[in-house]
Amino acid sequence: MAKKWLNKVKWDDNGLVPVIVQEVGTNDVLMFAFMNRDALQKTAELGEAVFWSRSRKRLWHKGEESGHVQKVHEMRLDCDEDVVLLKVTQVDNIACHTGRHSCFFQKFEGDAESGDWQTVEPVLKDPSQIYTAKP
């Protein structure tokens, strides 16, 4: 039987919904990703973030390789029912594959003519130490 709460989500033509991940406590926006029905269902079951990887075409349990899982405290649906917000605790404080706290580590500084994107968050851990080849 279809779950009513999953049917309420307005999925796009590819069966996906955009997801914003926000840290509990700081309210920092950590990342943006997509979920399909299975990913949202798994997230609710596990209490940890599971996304749909568009490049790998498979479910992606956040932290499955790095250990940097996201413990979900709350799931919210926006007013148009087409965007999900996850409020999470980020394990080891690293959400980004670059080894940073947030994927939003570049800030626009300057004006429209001469401005540029500046890196404003440090690398907390070298990605080569996070993602190692599996035997």
From Swiss-Prot:
Write out the residues that bind Zn(2+). Answer: 79, 96, 103
Q: What class of enzyme is it?
A: hydrolase
Primary location class = cytoplasm
Q: Which cofactor does it need?
A: Mg(2+); Zn(2+)
Pathway entry: Amino-acid biosynthesis; L-histidine biosynthesis; L-histidine from 5-phospho-alpha-D-ribose 1-diphosphate: step 3/9
Q: Name one GO cellular component term.
A: cytoplasm
Q: Which residues form a coiled coil?
A: none
Single GO BP term: L-histidine biosynthetic process
InterPro entries, per database record: PRA-CH, PRib_AMP_CycHydrolase_dom, PRib_AMP_CycHydrolase_sf
Give EC number(s), comma-separated.
3.5.4.19
Annotated Mg(2+) binding lies at 78, 80, 82
Recorded GO MF terms = magnesium ion binding; phosphoribosyl-AMP cyclohydrolase activity; zinc ion binding
The family database entries (SUPFAM superfamilies) matched by this protein are listed as: HisI-like
Q: Which UniProt keywords apply?
A: Amino-acid biosynthesis, Cytoplasm, Histidine biosynthesis, Hydrolase, Magnesium, Metal-binding, Zinc
> Cofactor: bound how, per the entry note?
Binds 1 Mg(2+) ion per subunit.
Which top-rank group of organisms is this from?
A: Bacteria
Fill in the subunit field for this protein: Homodimer.
Which family does the record assign?
Belongs to the PRA-CH family.
Q: What does this protein do?
A: Catalyzes the hydrolysis of the adenine ring of phosphoribosyl-AMP.
Name the UniProt record assigns to this protein: Phosphoribosyl-AMP cyclohydrolase
